[in-house]
Swiss-Prot record:
Domain remarks in the Swiss-Prot or TrEMBL record: The PRC barrel domain binds ribosomal protein uS19.
InterPro entries (UniProt xref): PRC_barrel-like_sf, PRC_RimM, RimM, RimM_N, RimM_N_sf, Transl_B-barrel_sf
Function: An accessory protein needed during the final step in the assembly of 30S ribosomal subunit, possibly for assembly of the head region. Essential for efficient processing of 16S rRNA. May be needed both before and after RbfA during the maturation of 16S rRNA. It has affinity for free ribosomal 30S subunits but not for 70S ribosomes.
A biological process from GO: rRNA processing
NCBIfam families xref list: 16S_RimM (TIGR02273)
Encoding gene (name): rimM
Gene3D superfamilies in alphabetical order: PRC-barrel domain (2.30.30.240), RimM (2.40.30.60)
SUBUNIT field: Binds ribosomal protein uS19.
The species this protein was found in: Acetivibrio thermocellus (strain ATCC 27405 / DSM 1237 / JCM 9322 / NBRC 103400 / NCIMB 10682 / NRRL B-4536 / VPI 7372) (Clostridium thermocellum)
Transmembrane intervals: none
Name this protein carries in UniProt: Ribosome maturation factor RimM
Domain PRC barrel: 96-169
HAMAP family: Ribosome_mat_RimM
GO CC annotations, alphabetized: cytoplasm; ribosome
């Protein structure tokens, strides 16, 4: 499993004292309130700079962060388009049968008769339930509702998901 998780993306500065505006990449933006520090980088690597978090505010759909050592707008500007990254061990504990999206991406998806449907490439948040985007071997996209009645098994050891598709969800050409 992935060692680091992206929990936000810095999209702009906020004010003149070095604060940044971040889009939360988590279902629970309040999780930022408990963070003491985070990595800030354009990509996950072994050499990501680590910043102490001085303050956290919530404004509309954004999180306003103040990092130690980032004290003016020019310094904050350099963090635009960077991700706020945490260690997996610092992540919130998920309820049973709930998964981090990054752990599902790349998973092989099969129907209950062991026919491979494709590879999970994305997860769409629709409000009522998530939808898994599965790309078949012939490049067709299958949209699968992330419901307990549909998703029968998720096995990270085998990198495999088994789904029981509702009648008519896909055509026979997949």
């Amino acid at each position: 499993m992935i060692q680091y998780l992206q929990v936000g993306k810095i999209v702009n500065t906020h004010g003149i004292k070095g604060e940044v505006k971040a889009i939360p990449l988590t279902d629970n933006p309040r999780r930022f309130n408990k963070l003491k520090w985070a990595y800030v980088s354009k990509e996950i690597s072994n050499e990501m700079p680590k910043f102490d978090i001085v303050s956290v505010k919530h404004h509309k759909n954004f999180v306003i962060l103040k990092f130690s050592g980032i004290d003016d707008m020019n310094a904050a500007e350099k963090l635009k388009e960077h991700f706020v990254i945490i260690d997996r061990k610092d992540a919130v504990k998920l309820p049973k049968d709930t998964f981090f999206i990054c752990d599902l991406i790349g998973m092989n998806v099969f129907d209950t008769e062991e026919k491979k449907l494709g590879v999970l490439t994305d997860v769409l948040s629709t409000g009522s339930n998530d939808v898994y985007v599965v790309k078949s071997d012939n490049n067709k996209e299958i949209l699968i509702p992330a419901l307990k009645s549909v998703v029968k098994k998720v096995c990270f050891e085998d990198n495999k998901m088994v789904v029981d598709l509702p009648q008519g969800l896909i055509d026979d050409e997949v």
